[in-house]
């Protein structure tokens, strides 16, 4: 269903399967002279050694969409999507939107984004700054130039603050600074006016003596944390 002229990487403006636009003109050797290109090496989009015009290709289909997720900061987020095709190969490309899905950019493999070109995207050490960002996958068939790229539904990441980095988000953590004193006891005021709320502050009154000790608990290594 995809004409050779297109699979070769050439131009067929009127989509009649002939090089260039009709009517076609040729020289004495039968070479088309009315086209703007042609007669160069045909393309091999998937680099498998078979020219695309000799290789059966097919449209890709979306099988599954990624799922939105909520995690604590500095943890790993996973997004999974998949596609299928009856012939040829598929190429995956994950994209990110920082503006609610209005614009999208291709992700590049890095220490933060792993697996940008396969069915599973990992976001390593997720930071608060990416909360509400959206992610989607684009699936295409490199050996089938007539295919239409398939886009998954977007999935959103929500990253929750975790003051003590114990992998329990503050919204769920009963002790946000791990000093052994419940947040309900310490509350969210700022007794010493240092800009750190009491439930995050290891020395809430600013007297130089950590809360864990003033509460009568044990702090063997004097780091302000219980134990």
Which residues does each predicted region cover?
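Extracellular calcium-associated, cysteine-rich motifs in secreted modular proteins
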Residues: 1-60, 146, 157-227
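Surface-exposed, proline-enriched loop/turn segments that connect beta strands in immunoglobulin-like
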Residues: 63-68
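Core motif of extracellular immunoglobulin-like domains
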Residues: 81, 94-95, 135-137
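Surface-exposed, flexible coil segments in extracellular/virion-facing regions
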Residues: 98-125
């Amino acid at each position: 269903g995809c004409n050779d002229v297109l699979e070769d990487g050439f131009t067929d403006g009127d989509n009649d399967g002939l090089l260039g636009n009709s009517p076609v003109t040729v020289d004495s050797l039968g070479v088309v002279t009315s086209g703007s290109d042609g007669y160069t090496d045909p393309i091999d989009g998937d680099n498998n050694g078979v020219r695309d015009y000799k290789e059966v290709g097919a449209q890709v289909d979306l099988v599954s969409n990624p799922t939105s997720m909520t995690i604590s900061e500095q943890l790993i987020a996973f997004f999974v999507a998949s596609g299928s095709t009856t012939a040829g190969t598929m190429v995956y490309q994950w994209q990110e939107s920082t503006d609610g899905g209005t614009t999208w950019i291709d992700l590049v493999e890095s220490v933060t984004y792993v697996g940008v070109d396969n069915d599973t995207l990992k976001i390593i050490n997720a930071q608060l700054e990416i909360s509400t960002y959206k992610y989607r996958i684009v699936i295409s068939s490199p050996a089938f130039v007539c295919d239409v790229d398939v886009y998954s539904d977007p999935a959103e990441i929500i990253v929750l603050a975790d003051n003590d980095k114990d992998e329990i988000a503050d919204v769920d953590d009963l002790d946000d600074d791990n000093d052994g004193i419940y947040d309900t006891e310490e509350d969210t005021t700022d007794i010493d006016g240092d800009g750190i709320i009491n439930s995050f502050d290891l020395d809430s009154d600013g007297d130089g003596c950590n809360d864990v000790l003033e509460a009568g608990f044990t702090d063997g290594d004097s780091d302000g944390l219980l134990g």
